[in-house]
A protein has these predicted regions:
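Long, low-complexity, charged/polar intrinsically disordered regions in eukaryotic proteins
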Residues: 1-35
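Glycine-rich, charged/polar anion/phosphate-binding loops
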Residues: 5, 13-16, 205-210, 225, ...
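C-terminal helix-cap and adjacent tail motif
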Residues: 343-376
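Glycine/small-residue-rich phosphate/adenosyl-binding loop
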Residues: 214-305
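Short conserved catalytic/interaction loops centered on acidic-Pro-aromatic/His motifs
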Residues: 288, 313-341
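Residues forming anionic-ligand binding surfaces in small-molecule and nucleic-acid pockets
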Residues: 147-175, 279-291
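Long, charge-rich, low-complexity alpha-helical segments
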Residues: 23-26, 33-157, 318
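Active-site pocket-lining segments that scaffold enzyme catalytic pockets across diverse folds
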Residues: 183-232
């Protein structure tokens, strides 16, 4: 019997965050907390099923599921691939972090972790993919129509006012003037998109309300600012304090090269004077909604806050952008968050429009021609 350094018998148990699927006639088991995958033959799958709780190696060997000559090597391999945990080793911190999402797992935890740190294809690679495959890949229809149903035409909208103007003017910009934005402009955009406007007396604790909706008023979204060229603010990485309406400096300025790493495939966004990251503190939502569907609330809420951010920037005549193609772990390392309890979900930024340009949707070249829809 194998014993730990303290002389105690070593116990093993199946890892708590495993998802299995058949692929190419092989069962593959994925520990989504550690990101490690392994092919598992039937006899080893049966061995794992015996380890629902801490089990001694002696009892496991006695089950006869694996030939005695291969037993020790099999256990070592399962531990190395993080499919088994040993009682004499410290828990992996990633596993402990994923445990905090327990009531959402495996659905939300698996989706959250397996969609991080994606390798994004360059636009030119996507355009050439159909040619490489020997077939044309046509895009789906841009709109949906019911051809066999009656449609009632609506009156034209009353599109007067500042909000309607901002909604119509909002565009994604990919080129920016070298002029800085002002601290007043940044403060206005942050206050009216992410700042706490009022506190409501709740049964247990005061409840914050912002300009964007949040399921159960949980307001799980946090905002971080990467200030690169703001008149009146030292370059650096800041956390926005929504109640105090202030910026807390948490790290030195990111280099331009580092900022480009944040947005793989969209490096031109790093030229903006300000980049903003929207994260979610999942515990706030979990406290009230212990079912996996509530993970969607975190995604939607980040979108609400970001849209408010973009509209406020547009109303001030600034050039905003938003992007979801992110280098998650690089960003989270620089923000000092673990990516599980609190994770980056979305990014945006603001700059000034380049001189003489009505819209710069492309990193270089002229903007495409625009045809306005006369119905709206």
């Amino acid at each position: 019997m194998e014993r730990s350094a303290r002389g105690r018998a070593v116990l093993v148990r199946r890892a708590q965050h495993l998802v299995a699927q058949w692929r190419d006639r092989t069962l593959r088991v994925h520990n989504y907390a550690t990101g490690i995958k392994a092919e598992v033959p039937p006899e080893v799958c049966e061995l794992l099923s015996r380890c629902d709780d801490w089990t001694s190696l002696t009892d496991l060997a006695g089950a006869g599921l694996v030939p005695p000559s291969a037993f020790s090597a099999t256990i070592r391999k399962l531990v190395r691939f993080t499919l088994l945990e040993r009682s004499d080793r410290r828990p992996d911190p990633r596993v402990s972090a994923v445990d905090t999402l327990r009531s959402w797992n495996p659905q939300a935890g698996f989706f959250h972790l397996t969609t991080k740190d994606v390798r994004f294809a360059a636009p030119q690679a996507l355009r050439s993919a159909p040619a490489r495959n020997g077939a044309e890949r046509r895009p789906p229809a841009a709109i949906k129509r019911y051809t066999n149903r009656r449609t009632t035409d609506l009156p034209r909208p009353d599109a007067h006012g500042e909000l309607a103007s901002a909604l119509r003017a909002r565009r994604t910009w990919r080129r920016y003037s070298q002029k800085p934005i002002t601290l007043d402009e940044l403060a206005t955009v942050l206050a009216l998109s992410a700042g706490i406007q009022v506190w409501v007396k709740g049964a247990d604790i005061p409840i914050p309300l912002k300009t964007s909706p949040s399921g159960g008023a949980r307001h799980a979204t946090e905002v971080y600012v990467v200030a690169q060229n703001v008149d009146g603010l030292k370059p650096g990485i800041y956390h926005y304090a929504p109640a105090r309406h202030g910026l807390t400096r948490i790290a030195r300025a990111a280099s331009k090269a580092r900022a480009r790493e944040y947005v793989p495939g969209s490096e031109y966004f790093a030229d903006a004077p300000v980049m903003v990251f929207f994260t979610s503190v999942f515990a706030r939502i979990l406290w009230r909604y212990p079912y996996a569907r509530a993970y969607r609330a975190a995604l939607i809420e980040a979108g609400h806050v970001c849209q408010s951010f973009l509209l406020m920037a547009t109303s001030l005549g600034l050039a905003p952008f938003s992007v979801m193609a992110l280098a998650d772990s690089i960003i989270e390392d620089d923000l000092g968050i673990d990516g599980i309890r609190e994770s980056v979900l979305y990014a945006a930024g603001i700059g000034r429009p380049p001189r003489g340009v009505a819209w710069a949707p492309l990193a270089r070249g002229r903007a495409p021609k625009v045809r306005r829809n006369p119905r709206v």
